[in-house]
C-alpha cells in the first residue's frame, strides 16, 4: 500500500477495523500479513480476537509473527490466549451496545461487512436496532465453532437472537436472518434448560423484561423438577423472577414452578401460590409513581396519567417519600420524573434502578428545554428510559409514555391478558389442589380466592369454587355456602354441589344458619335446587335428622 492510502485507512480509526478483520481469513498469506500490519496501526482492541484467531490457525510463520506483534502493540493477550473467550468477550460488548462499537451513533442504519474473494469487501445496510445483535451473534457463533461446549457463549447467542426478534422494527426483513429460518424460541428450547436459565439470569440482571418473559417460556418447555430452581453459578434465576418488579414475569415464573409440582421445598416456594392467587383477581389496571418538585407539577402529570387509565400513587418529592406506597402496591408499571433539576435526574434514575420494587419499571423523564438534549443523549440507547420536554402537548407525552411501556415491558396488561393469566393460574391452583401438593399448598390462597369468588362470574367463579371445595378450612366452606345462597337457578345448584364436595371431603364446617337454609330449600325449593340441597344435607351427616319430618310432611300431601 502507498503511504497515502495507508494514512487514509488509519485515519478512519475504528471504522476501518471491522472491514479489515472481516477480510483476514479469506485473503492470501501475503495479503494477511499486509492487513495485519495495517490493523496494528489502528489503536482499537476490537481487532484482537481476529488477530489471535489468525495467529492460532495460520500455518505461515511470518503471518503468525505479524499477528503477535500487532496484538502486543494493541495491548492484547499473549500467544496461546483463549481465542473463543476473546470472541465471546467482544460479542458481549456488542450485546451491551457499547458506544465505541457503534459507527454511526444516532443514525437509522449501520454497516455490516462481508468478504468475497472474487469481489472483495461487501457492505450492506442494517437497521440500527438489530445491528448489535447481528454482530453479537456472528462473534458468538465463531466462539462456539472454536469451543462448542461453552454454555455461556451459547446463552449469549440465544439472548442475542431473542433480542434481535424483540428489537426488529415492524415489517423489516433482517439481511442477516433469512425469512425462512427458525424463530428464536426454537433455538432457545433446543439449547436446554441450563442455557435458558442463563438467559433468564442475564435478563434479570439487566432489567430486560421482554427477554425475561421469553426465557421463562423456553425454560417451562424444557426444565422439570429441581432443574427449575437449580443453582446456576450462584444464581437461581427462575426463583429471582418471582420477585422481579414486573407482574407478567412474576406470573410466568409462578406458573412454570407450579406446573413442575415440586415435592421438596425450595427457597422462594412460599411465594408461588400467593402470586397465582393474586393473578386471579388481578385487573388490567396500571400503577404509576410520580416524583415532582411541587404539587402543581404532580397534579398536572397525575391528570394525564389518570386519563390514560393509570392509578397514580400519592404525591412525593422523592422516591424515599413514596417508599411506603410502593411497598403496598402489587407492582409499579411506570415511574415519572417531572421537572427535576437537571443534575438530579441521573441520580434519581440510578436510585430507581437500585430499588428492588421499581428496578425494572420504565422511567419517563419530563424535563426543561435547557437540559433536554443532554439527558436525551445520555439515555438514547436505554429502552427503559424516555426523555421528553415537559412543555409538550399532553397527547404527545401520552403517546411517548405508551411507546415507552410497549418497548420496556411489553405494553399495558390488557383485559384479555389479565383474564388469561387468571384462567391459567386457576388451572394451576386446581392441579395443585387435586394432587394435594404439600410444598405449594393451595390453602395459602384462601383469602384471595374467597375475595375472587365475590368478584368473578360464570365459569371462572365455578372454577374458584372448585378449588375452595378442596381446601379444608371452615371459611372456605362457609364462603361457598354464602355464595350459593346469594345466587339462584343453575349457579346456585352448581355452587351447592361444590359445598357438598367440600363436606364429603372434610365434614360439615357450616354454621346453624346454613343448615336451616338448606333444610328450607329441601322443603320448598324448586326441584333442581331441592335435589342439590338434599344431597348436601345428606353429606353434612347431621345428628338431628332433618329428613324424617320432611317424609312425614310429604306423606300428608
Label each region the model flagged.
Residues 315-334, 342:
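Acidic, metal-coordinating helix/loop segments flanking the phosphotransfer/catalytic sites
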Residues 2-14, 19-25, 31-44, 53, ...:
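Structural detector for internal amphipathic alpha-helices that build alpha-solenoid repeat scaffolds
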Residues 152-153:
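TPR alpha-solenoid repeat register
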Residues 317, 366-406:
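Output/docking surface of receiver
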Residues 82-84, 89-139, 163-197, 229-238, ...:
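Short coil/linker segments at helix-helix boundaries
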Residues 1, 8, 19-27, 50-58, ...:
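Alpha-solenoid HEAT/Armadillo-like helical repeat scaffolds in large eukaryotic proteins
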Residues 332-360, 366-375:
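Conserved phosphotransfer microenvironments
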Residues 284-297, 301-306, 335:
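Conserved acidic segment of CheY-like receiver
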Amino acid at each position: 500500500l502507498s503511504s497515502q492510502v495507508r494514512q487514509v485507512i488509519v485515519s478512519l480509526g475504528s471504522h476501518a477495523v471491522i472491514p479489515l478483520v472481516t477480510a483476514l481469513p479469506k485473503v492470501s498469506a501475503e495479503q494477511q500479513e499486509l492487513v495485519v500490519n495495517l490493523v496494528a496501526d489502528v489503536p482499537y482492541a476490537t481487532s484482537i480476537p481476529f488477530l489471535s484467531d489468525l495467529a492460532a490457525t495460520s500455518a505461515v510463520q511470518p503471518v503468525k509473527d505479524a499477528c503477535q506483534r500487532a496484538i502486543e502493540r494493541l495491548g492484547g493477550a499473549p500467544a496461546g490466549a483463549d481465542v473463543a473467550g476473546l470472541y465471546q468477550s467482544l460479542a458481549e460488548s456488542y450485546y451491551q451496545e457499547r458506544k465505541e462499537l457503534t459507527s454511526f451513533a444516532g443514525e437509522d442504519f449501520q454497516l455490516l461487512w462481508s468478504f468475497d474473494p472474487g469481489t472483495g469487501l461487501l457492505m450492506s445496510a442494517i437497521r440500527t436496532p438489530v445491528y448489535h445483535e447481528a454482530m453479537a451473534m456472528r462473534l458468538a457463533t465463531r466462539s462456539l465453532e472454536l469451543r462448542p461446549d461453552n454454555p455461556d457463549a451459547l446463552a449469549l447467542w440465544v439472548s442475542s437472537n431473542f433480542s434481535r426478534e424483540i428489537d426488529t422494527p415492524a415489517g423489516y426483513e433482517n439481511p442477516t436472518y433469512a425469512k425462512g429460518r427458525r424463530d428464536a424460541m426454537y433455538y432457545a428450547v433446543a439449547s436446554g434448560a441450563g442455557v435458558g436459565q442463563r438467559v433468564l439470569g442475564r435478563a434479570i440482571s439487566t432489567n430486560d423484561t421482554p427477554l425475561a418473559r421469553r426465557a421463562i417460556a423456553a425454560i417451562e418447555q424444557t426444565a422439570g423438577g429441581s432443574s427449575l430452581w437449580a443453582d446456576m453459578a450462584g444464581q437461581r434465576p427462575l426463583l429471582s423472577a418471582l420477585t422481579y418488579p414486573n407482574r407478567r414475569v412474576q406470573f410466568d415464573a409462578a406458573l412454570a414452578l407450579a406446573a413442575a409440582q415440586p415435592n421438596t421445598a425450595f427457597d422462594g416456594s412460599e411465594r408461588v401460590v400467593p402470586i397465582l392467587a393474586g393473578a386471579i383477581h388481578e385487573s388490567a389496571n396500571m400503577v404509576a409513581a410520580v416524583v415532582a418538585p411541587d404539587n402543581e407539577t404532580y397534579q398536572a402529570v397525575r391528570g394525564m396519567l389518570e386519563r390514560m387509565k393509570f392509578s397514580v400513587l400519592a404525591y412525593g418529592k422523592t422516591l424515599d417519600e413514596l417508599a411506603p406506597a410502593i411497598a403496598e402496591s402489587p407492582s409499579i408499571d411506570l415511574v415519572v420524573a417531572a421537572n427535576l433539576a437537571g443534575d438530579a435526574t441521573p441520580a434519581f434514575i440510578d436510585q430507581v434502578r437500585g430499588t428492588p420494587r421499581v428496578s425494572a419499571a420504565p422511567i419517563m423523564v419530563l424535563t426543561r428545554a435547557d437540559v433536554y438534549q443532554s439527558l436525551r443523549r445520555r439515555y438514547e440507547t436505554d429502552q427503559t428510559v424516555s426523555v421528553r420536554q415537559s412543555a409538550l402537548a399532553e397527547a404527545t407525552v401520552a403517546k411517548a409514555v405508551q411507546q415507552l411501556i410497549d418497548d420496556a415491558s411489553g405494553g399495558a396488561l390488557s383485559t384479555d391478558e389479565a383474564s388469561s393469566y387468571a384462567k391459567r393460574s386457576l388451572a394451576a391452583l386446581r392441579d395443585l389442589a387435586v394432587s394435594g401438593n404439600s410444598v405449594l399448598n393451595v390453602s395459602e390462597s384462601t383469602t384471595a380466592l374467597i375475595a375472587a369468588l365475590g368478584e368473578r362470574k360464570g365459569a371462572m367463579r365455578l372454577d374458584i369454587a372448585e378449588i375452595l371445595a378442596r381446601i379444608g378450612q371452615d371459611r372456605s366452606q362457609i364462603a361457598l355456602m354464602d355464595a350459593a345462597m346469594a345466587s339462584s337457578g343453575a349457579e346456585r345448584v352448581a355452587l351447592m354441589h361444590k359445598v357438598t364436595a367440600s363436606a364429603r371431603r372434610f365434614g360439615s364446617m357450616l354454621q346453624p344458619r346454613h343448615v336451616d337454609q338448606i333444610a328450607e330449600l329441601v322443603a320448598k325449593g324448586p326441584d333442581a335446587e331441592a335435589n342439590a340441597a338434599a344431597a348436601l344435607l345428606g353429606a353434612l351427616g347431621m345428628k338431628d335428622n332433618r329428613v324424617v319430618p320432611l317424609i312425614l310432611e310429604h306423606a300428608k300431601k
